[in-house]
Swiss-Prot record:
Keyword list, A-Z: Chromatin regulator, Chromosome, Methyltransferase, Nucleus, Phosphoprotein, Repressor, S-adenosyl-L-methionine, Transcription, Transcription regulation, Transferase
Catalytic activity: L-lysyl(20)-[histone H4] + S-adenosyl-L-methionine = N(6)-methyl-L-lysyl(20)-[histone H4] + S-adenosyl-L-homocysteine + H(+); N(6)-methyl-L-lysyl(20)-[histone H4] + S-adenosyl-L-methionine = N(6),N(6)-dimethyl-L-lysyl(20)-[histone H4] + S-adenosyl-L-homocysteine + H(+); N(6),N(6)-dimethyl-L-lysyl(20)-[histone H4] + S-adenosyl-L-methionine = N(6),N(6),N(6)-trimethyl-L-lysyl(20)-[histone H4] + S-adenosyl-L-homocysteine + H(+)
EC class name: transferase
Skewed-composition ranges (Basic and acidic residues): 677-688, 698-707, 722-735
The organism's taxonomic lineage, starting at the top: Eukaryota, Metazoa, Ecdysozoa, Arthropoda, Hexapoda
GO terms for biological process, alphabetical: constitutive heterochromatin formation; epigenetic regulation of gene expression; heterochromatin formation; methylation; transposable element silencing by heterochromatin formation
Native species: Drosophila melanogaster (Fruit fly)
Keyword Translocase set for record: no
Composition bias, Basic residues: 536-557, 1041-1055, 1289-1300
Name assigned to this protein: Histone-lysine N-methyltransferase Suv4-20
In-chain residues carrying the UniProt-annotated modification Phosphothreonine: 930
Function: Histone methyltransferase that specifically trimethylates 'Lys-20' of histone H4. H4 'Lys-20' trimethylation represents a specific tag for epigenetic transcriptional repression. Mainly functions in pericentric heterochromatin regions, thereby playing a central role in the establishment of constitutive heterochromatin in these regions. Acts as a dominant suppressor of position-effect variegation.
EC numbers on record: 2.1.1.361, 2.1.1.362
Location(s), subcellular: Nucleus; Chromosome
Length: 1300
């Protein structure tokens, strides 16, 4: 059987693959999978096409990559840095795969799993090469023969293999290998028990006991136990095949492999455990074949997801599914084994040349399995020869590589020239040398990272493997003179490669270590290159052209403002502990880099912000199409270039992220960078949790530093924007830095809002997510800032979250202005970043951790206030109330911005604590943005919209609306939950003919709360609307249960939604919501809410308030979260949306209720609204049916009174929306309710866009807040941080809605 060139390998990291796909970087799955199923020859056409496409993409990426090593598309190439050798073969696939989502992943995955004629598993990194893939033959082993006569169907083979690998291999390896079932769910059992069974078998070698224990466990699905004897026997035999892998006499072992990019550096490989001689048969290494009909191919295979182990049989002229232990054999262009048919449907492996202990067992998948002539192959041989994915990386780099390997004196490996024969002994010597160099390299790179440019370059060498550019980026990191690095870069890259290429080959860091650093090797390389790169940019504003080469390093912000910063970043990388990864850690964990860079010097904040954004952006970009510049820097650069005409926007865009001059270059490099970031982000995503940990700590430091360095930040920004926009940027940044002037900030915010609106309008299509994010950013002003630009900010937001804690003091002084400034910039950035990629980024960037951290920080801040005795709360409320009243008055007066600004000032002055809490959030994340989170809401069309409407209207339209707005109070007042729901429903039901209720929420979350919140976040508006309205009939019955849950999520969502002051400024006139239903995504343009008096001016939030009546910005009076958009009747409901849901989940002690009531006492509507806000803050618990609701009764009455007075006749859209973001100490409610859903459909869509940040805050708050919220209204869920950031969150949410 001829190895099918298109055969894809069964990757161990099916799950990873999926992740990749979510990340876009590696997950683009090989669309060529179908083609990959075809044989090399017969399917060559298909494969060729996909391959050529991949090749083209790859080559284009390659070029970019050459220029800037960190290009995501070339990620395969770049990953080659650390993966360099490994990547060479596999990576191209990954690259191709990433790019075309077709062939590469195939190749990569294919080689591992595919047992097909294509049978090589190209990516050992993929995790499992399909030994059998090359051959269509049967398994050689007796076990394989067990099923010979009764060959399994492809579906049965897939099921049995998925189960067998999940029972035996996955527990042993510690991660989930590739699965044929793309919806495979990990067994809900204690994997330690399964691991113990395998470990015991390794000691006892007793198959019967092991199989008996496996069959007796709870992990065998019931339906498999009910199968007939033949089917049961087949499963038994397949399990035995995998157990034989652990037989002491098998002569091989399955190990984790981190070479191939396809699996994001985590796959499996087969290593020899004894010496094999030529012509030996490895009997236990068997694979099973199941012939695929075209119908079965269509039904079972999903391109780029599970077509990794499909091969084409030239003998049978059909595609075959290859599964079994041999599917984990990876491909190598100089393979030491081949597949040998042992029966009709089994194959084993025959040794082609002597294999030493510890050597990887590889097979040749085919001549064109990984693209034409295997141009995307990442195998060790291709790495050594400088071919495949490693070809054309960079002459210097390749030279360094080949020289490092001792293969040639002058890059003969590339092509041409003489070189020594590749004898086993020579190759082994090279490997041993590389190994010895590896350890040295590791220490060197760690040392060098912190030490110097050349060393950094060496660290970047990994990145450089992608090309000299990568190395240069790293090298330049330390050196300000990066312009000249072009030539130096190559040399440095070469020298570094010589040192580090071995590193790459050896894979010095374990995947675990990398993940702990929050990145994959490739990410590390890219980040290091980027960090260096950014430094280059930073140092060479003038040399943008030069930078330009490294432009994908392009995160200018990331590049250290100063050499010191660069060094700090490098050091941080070193701290991250990976020579290559360390750098990435620094850059990738921009937070880390940022921290060190911030510490480094004046430019540090820029650098820090950039690096964090870079990392996040990478993640985002991986997910997002190349369109959105994943990193804030990137986005900024392109946006800046595009919107240079918009000075305001430019400054915002430029922030520290981009230099005007670079903007033009940015446009060129952005695509590259985006791709780089894509891959990085993808990897980062995988390692997000770990990286977030490290980066969080770093970011804490960083933010502390940043807080102290805000002025420095200003300066660095000033330095950076030398071009036309530099002045504006400087000004804006300075404003940000000197967030002290709330008034100025307010003005800036307004301007930013105007600009944002313009920009948003301009970039509306892609900006839907971006705008939503902008709101989110506004909410978490500082933290979201970067986030906005980089959704990638996930990391940065995390970092920023932790930083926030340190920043609270500073926040208090700067908060108001900062938030507006940040908001402005964020909005601008957002507008800039509104590329389609942004949406992807949005989706990809939901970082449970960052938002959580952010939320926690906000919580901490709020809670710091909240923790203070209730008195503080009350005083805060009083201050907030006063501020709110004045604000409301101003707003009513029709001076939304002015009122906002003064409100902020007053709130700040009157409520320093509150202000601090609120602003801390904004202040903390000038650079960092909270990534958006994506929630998966399963919505069900409400059974009887009319009935629901009637119920909601009947339940007290006005009260219902108010209840909605003040979740606890109004609910209580009107029908409790019913009224809340009705508030949303009112908006939704009356406006929308059809309403949906949330059937199920699935979110990506790190914390239990996150899931709900995430979902809510994504669908927050719909969720709010639906949650409130979903069970109109049920609601009364299920009120307690459902409403509690809904309220909690709602309060979270509302807090998220309630547009922060930023939304007040920056909400574009036109809002866009992005709804994702299953595979469909709909973008809904929400017409600008009818400008209701000054309300429209204020923002969606305020605009829905109809002149800011209730929409005094809760964020300004951080405790005054009652951003109620009372004019619910007006279209402003879109902004109101956030408010409606803004009911704060955080319960406030009943004691709080008292103050709110007091607050209510003010007769003025503004004060009422404020009171409501306070009350709702106090009574947020009441929002949740906890008994707190009762406590909220008074509040709710007040709210009702207030809202009724306010809305009187406008009960429908969200009267009740007086958002009570009852963040316990910080009334972050800031929900602009009322108009919440003038346009329910929009609202519906908006939910998807809810910023994860608010969600994170909500989520985090539960942790912190719950401690504080004894009144277990579950309300604790709404973190104080949420409330503090509640305003922000709410605003953010509203902005989301509005912008979306």
């Amino acid at each position: 059987m001829v190895v099918g060139s298109n055969h894809t390998r069964r990757g161990e990291t099916g799950s990873r693959f999926t992740n990749s796909s979510s990340s876009s970087s590696t997950s683009g799955g090989p669309t060529a999978s179908a083609s990959s199923t075809t044989s090399v020859t017969s399917s060559l056409a298909t494969n060729s096409t996909s391959t050529s496409t991949a090749a083209a993409l790859l080559s284009s990426m390659s070029h970019k990559s050459h220029g800037p090593p960190p290009s995501a598309p070339p990620s395969a190439h770049h990953q080659t840095n650390q993966q360099h050798h490994q990547v060479a073969h596999s990576q191209p696939h990954a690259t191709h795969y990433q790019q075309t989502n077709q062939h590469p992943s195939h190749h990569h995955q294919s080689h591992q799993s595919s047992n097909g004629s294509g049978g090589g598993s190209a990516g050992s990194g993929s995790g499992s090469g399909s030994v059998v893939s090359g051959l269509n033959g049967c398994n050689g082993s007796a076990v394989s023969r067990l099923s010979q006569s009764t060959g399994m169907s492809p579906r049965e083979l897939s099921e049995n293999d998925d189960l067998a690998t999940s029972l035996i291999l996955d527990p042993h390896l510690g991660f989930q290998t590739h699965k044929m079932n793309i919806r495979f769910r990990p067994l809900k059992v204690d994997t330690q028990q399964l691991k113990a069974i395998v470990d015991d078998f390794i000691h006892t070698q007793n198959y019967d006991i092991a199989i008996q224990r496996i069959y007796e466990g709870p992990w065998i699905p019931r339906h498999l136990k009910n199968k007939n004897k033949i089917a049961t026997k087949r499963l038994h035999d397949h399990i035995v095949r995998y157990l034989r892998v652990f037989d002491k006499d098998s002569g091989f072992a399955i190990e984790a492999c981190y070479r191939y990019t396809l699996e994001e550096q985590r796959g499996a490989k087969i290593s020899s455990t004894k010496r094999w001689s030529k012509n030996d048969k490895i009997e236990c290494l068997v694979g099973c074949i199941a012939e695929l009909t075209e119908a079965e191919e269509a039904a079972l295979l999903h391109s780029g997801k599970n077509d990794f182990s499909v091969m084409y049989s030239c003998r049978k002229n059909c595609a075959q599914l290859w599964l079994g232990p041999a599917a984990y054999i990876n491909h190598d262009c100089r393979a030491n084994c081949k597949f040998l048919a042992t029966g009709r449907d089994t194959a084993c492996v025959k040794v082609l040349r002597d294999i030493e202990v510890g050597e990887e067992i590889t097979c040749f998948y085919g001549e064109d399995f990984f693209g034409d002539s295997n141009r995307y192959c990442e195998c060790e041989t291709c790495e050594r020869r400088g071919t495949g994915a490693f070809a054309g990386k960079d002459d210097g780099l390749m030279l360094g590589l080949s020289m490092g390997l001792g293969l040639a004196s002058s890059g003969p490996g590339n092509n041409g020239g003489y070189r020594l024969r590749e004898t086993d002994n020579r190759i082994n010597r090279i490997k041993s040398r590389a190994n010895s160099t590896n350890s040295t390299s590791n220490s060197n790179s760690n040392t060098n990272d912190s030490t110097g440019p050349s060393e950094t370059s060496s660290t970047n060498g990994l990145v450089a493997s992608g090309g000299a550019g990568g190395a240069t980026g790293a090298a330049m990191l330390p050196t300000p003179s990066q312009q000249s690095t072009g030539g130096k870069e190559a040399t440095a890259a070469v020298s570094l490669l010589e040192k580090k290429l071995p590193n790459v080959v050896v894979s010095p860091l374990t995947m675990k270590e990398l993940r702990q650093k929050g990145m994959t090797k490739y990410d590390a390389e890219m980040i290091m290159a980027n960090a260096a790169y950014q430094q280059q940019h930073h140092h060479q504003h003038h040399f943008h052209h030069h930078h330009h080469h490294h432009h994908h390093h392009h995160n200018h912000g990331q590049h250290a403002s100063t050499g010191a910063e660069a060094t700090a970043a490098v050091q941080q990388m070193a701290a991250m502990q990976k020579p290559g990864v360390g750098g990435t850690g620094a850059a990738g964990n921009a937070g880390a880099t940022t921290v060190s860079s911030v510490a480094a010097g004046a430019g540090s904040e820029v650098n820090g912000g950039r690096s964090t954004s870079l990392r996040k952006s990478m993640r985002v970009n991986s997910t997002s199409s190349s369109i959105s510049t994943a990193s804030a820097d990137e986005v900024i650069a392109p946006v800046v270039a595009a919107s240079i005409s918009l000075p305001s926007k430019a400054p915002v865009v430029l922030m520290p992220r981009c230099k005007p001059a670079q903007m033009a270059i940015a446009a060129l490099h952005q695509s590259q960078q985006r791709q780089l970031r894509r891959s990085e982000r993808q990897k980062e995503k995988l390692t997000d949790g770990e990286s977030s940990d490290t980066s969080s700590e770093q970011q804490k430091k960083e933010q502390k530093q940043q807080d102290h360095q805000l002025p420095q930040k200003m300066f660095s920004l000033a330095e950076e924007p030398q071009p036309e926009k530099s002045e504006e940027k400087q000004q804006e940044q300075q404003k940000r830095v000197t967030r002290n002037s709330a008034g100025r900030v307010g003005l800036v915010a307004r301007l930013a809002t105007a600009h944002n609106n313009n920009i948003a309008t301009t970039t509306n299509s892609s900006s839907s997510s971006n705008k939503a994010t902008t709101i989110t950013n506004c909410n978490n002003h500082n933290s979201n800032n970067s986030s906005r630009i980089n959704h990638n900010s996930n990391l940065s937001s995390r970092l920023s979250v932790k930083s926030r804690k340190p920043a609270p003091s500073e926040a208090s002084s700067i908060p108001s202005s900062t938030s507006s400034e940040n908001q402005q910039q964020q909005a601008t950035r957002r507008s800039c970043s509104p590329t389609p990629a942004y949406k992807k980024n949005l989706l990809a960037s939901f970082d449970p951790d960052p938002p959580s951290t952010q939320g926690i920080k906000e919580q901490l801040k709020d809670e710091s206030v909240t923790y203070s005795p209730v008195k503080q709360k009350r005083s805060r409320r009083a201050a907030a109330l006063a501020a709110a009243q004045s604000i409301h008055c101003e707003a009513l007066g029709g001076f939304p911005t002015g009122s906002t600004g003064s409100q902020r000032k007053r709130a700040q002055a009157g409520e320093p604590t509150t202000s601090c809490s609120s602003t801390t959030i904004s202040n903390v994340e000038p650079l960092l943005k909270t990534p958006e989170r994506r929630l998966k809401l399963t919505l069900r069309m409400k059974r009887s919209p009319i009935l629901d409407e009637v119920i909601e209207l009947g339940t007290s339209l006005s009260n219902g609306g108010a209840g909605r707005g003040a979740p606890g109070s109004h609910r209580e007042g009107t029908a409790g939950e019913g009224s809340v729901r009705s508030a949303l429903n009112l908006t939704g039901s009356s406006s929308n003919g059809i309403e949906y209720e949330i059937l199920r929420m699935e979110g990506i979350s790190e914390h239990g709360n996150d899931d709900d919140e995430d979902e809510e976040e994504d669908d927050e508006e719909p969720a709010a609307e639906e949650e409130e309205e979903p069970p109109p009939k049920e609601e009364l019955q299920l009120v307690n249960k459902k409403q509690r849950k809904k309220q909690r999520s709602r309060s979270r969502s509302s807090q998220r939604r309630s547009p922060a002051p930023s939304s007040v400024y920056g909400t574009p006139q036109k809002k866009r919501l992005r709804l994702i239903f299953g595979n469909e995504s709909h973008t809904i343009d929400i017409p600008p809410a009818a400008a209701e008096g000054s309300g429209s001016g204020l923002d969606d939030l305020n605009s829905s308030g109809g002149g800011g009546d209730e929409s005094f910005n809760a964020s300004y009076a951080s405790s005054t979260s009652l951003t109620v958009n009372t004019s619910s009747s007006s279209t402003s409901s879109s902004s109101g949306v956030g408010g409606a849901t803004s009911t704060s989940a955080e319960p406030v002690d009943s004691s709080t209720v008292g103050p709110p009531i007091a607050a209510q006492s003010p007769s003025s509507t503004t004060s009422s609204s404020f009171q409501s806000a306070c009350t709702s803050t106090t009574n947020s618990n009441s929002y949740f049916p906890n008994g707190k609701q009762r406590a909220a009764g008074e509040d709710s009455y007040a709210m009702h009174y207030y809202q009724l007075g306010k809305f009187a006749g406008t009960p429908s859209p969200g009267q009740g929306q007086a958002i009570v973001s009852s963040s316990s100490g910080s009334s972050g409610g800031g929900g602009s309710g009322a108009g919440f859903l003038s346009m329910p459909k929009h609202t519906f869509g908006t939910c998807a866009l809810l910023a994860p940040t608010s969600f994170a805050c909500l989520q985090n708050q539960p942790q912190i807040s719950q401690q504080k919220t004894s009144s277990g209204g579950g309300a604790g869920v709404v973190p104080t941080s949420t409330s503090t950031g509640a305003v922000t969150s709410h605003h953010h949410t509203n902005n989301h809605h509005g912008q979306k």
